[in-house]
């Protein structure tokens, strides 16, 4: 078994959301079963930006992203959470 890396796209509710404060909120929302590896802001369209988070999970624990997705979706200012990629590293 190994480590699972998941790239997760977090979409803010609007273009008015401060991306730096959203990044801090996402960092604090990472569950104990996961480790935040990287985070970046990606422009989408018309001034809207997405937060891309790479999270590492233990494959022995199932490697599922549901707990992380649920935690991220509860953060204030988050419109949606979508897993873009999952793979073993």
From Swiss-Prot:
Gene3D superfamilies from the UniProt entry: 3.30.70.60
One Pfam family linked to the record: EF1_GNE
UniProt entry keywords in alphabetical sequence: Elongation factor, Protein biosynthesis
Molecular function terms, GO-annotated: translation elongation factor activity
InterPro entries linked to this entry: eEF-1beta-like_sf, EF1B_bsu/dsu_GNE, Transl_elong_EF1B/ribsomal_bS6, Transl_elong_EF1B_B_arc
Purpose of the protein: Promotes the exchange of GDP for GTP in EF-1-alpha/GDP, thus allowing the regeneration of EF-1-alpha/GTP that could then be used to form the ternary complex EF-1-alpha/GTP/AAtRNA.
Family: Belongs to the EF-1-beta/EF-1-delta family.
The protein's name: Elongation factor 1-beta
Protein's gene: ef1b
């Amino acid at each position: 078994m190994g480590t699972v890396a998941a790239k997760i796209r977090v979409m803010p509710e609007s273009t008015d959301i401060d991306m730096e404060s959203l990044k801090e909120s996402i960092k604090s929302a990472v569950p104990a079963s996961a480790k935040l590896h990287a985070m970046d802001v990606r422009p989408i369209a018309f001034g809207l930006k997405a937060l891309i988070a790479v999270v590492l999970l233990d494959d022995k624990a199932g490697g599922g992203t549901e707990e992380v997705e649920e935690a991220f979706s509860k953060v204030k200012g988050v419109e949606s959470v979508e897993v873009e990629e999952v793979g073993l590293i």
